[in-house]
Design a protein with these regions (language model features):
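Glycine-rich phosphate/pyrophosphate-handling loop used in enzymes and phosphotransfer proteins
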Residues: 1-269
Length: 269
């Protein structure tokens, strides 16, 4: 897809068929369908009183929310009295190419379980629930109005083939549809396979992804002066987010923001 041919219309979003807008007849029949087959909470399975909320009230309350005290730079949860003007303890002494990273949940407990089911359990349908959580957070924070393009962190083609989908792509698509934003699914390419970041130390994570991403040639002019939202499932050390942002800034992006469903807690203040 070239920048000139990309569209902000949801119909242009390369999402799975169930993410597209359904025909009028199906929409008309939807109340009867929901009455016969009520939706269930994605976390505990109980029938939902309010459709399209994905979580029952109890599970929604029990999710490990980052809360109002978060680092304004990397998005990690911090104490209520933490000094974060220059970042938190986990990020203030690091160079980060992105302007800000945000996440509604901590990567623990039920959030970790759902994300692992999503990408490793191949539960692509969870993109709707997790994308809705992230979308609610972006809407409340106002960040959805601060970007021009939405781009997923790309997977290497071998990993995408084995998994069947790129979880970041599905989340990015949910956000593009909800906020009517321009989706750039092929803005970045992963140039080489990398080790799974989970078992690596912070320093090794940075080395692992350094040089792993590139801006695709058709976007070299389309990204100039744009504010880009990079989307992924989990923010751990920020190595992947930093490398993606570094490539985009080098390509002329005005600003890069990062949005993930969950954040691994690292800061002590």
């Amino acid at each position: 897809m070239s920048p000139g041919s990309a569209s902000s219309s949801p119909s242009a979003c390369p999402c799975p068929p169930e993410a597209a807008r359904r025909p009028g007849l199906l929409l008309a029949l939807e109340p009867f369908w929901r009455l016969a087959f009520p939706e269930s909470c994605v976390a505990c399975g109980v029938p939902l009183e309010r459709p399209r909320r994905h979580f029952c009230a109890a599970c929604h309350r029990a999710l490990p929310w980052v809360g109002e005290h978060a680092c304004p730079r990397c998005g990690d949860a911090v104490g209520s009295h933490a000094r974060t003007a220059a970042g938190c303890a986990a990020c203030r002494n690091r160079h980060l190419a992105f302007a800000r990273a945000v996440a509604p949940l901590r990567y623990e407990g039920k959030a970790r379980e759902l994300i692992l089911k999503f990408k490793l359990g191949r539960r692509a349908s969870l993109a709707h629930a997790l994308g809705a959580l992230l979308g609610d957070f972006l809407a409340e924070s106002g960040l959805s109005r601060a970007v021009d393009l939405v781009a997923p962190v790309p997977l290497h083609w071998r990993r995408r083939l084995s998994r069947g989908f790129n979880q970041a792509m599905l989340l990015a698509c949910e956000l593009a549809i909800r906020f009517d934003l321009r989706l750039a699914p092929r803005l970045l390419v992963r140039r080489r396979a990398t080790e799974t970041q989970t078992a690596l130390s912070g320093l090794r994570r940075g080395a692992n992804v350094r040089g792993a991403f590139a801006l695709r040639a058709p976007w070299r002019r389309g990204v100039l002066g744009r504010r880009v939202l990079v989307v992924d499932d989990v923010f751990t050390t920020g190595a992947t987010a930093h490398e993606c942002a570094r490539v985009l800034r080098a390509g002329g992006a005005a600003e890069v923001l990062v949005a993930t469903v969950a954040h691994t807690h690292r800061s002590s203040g």
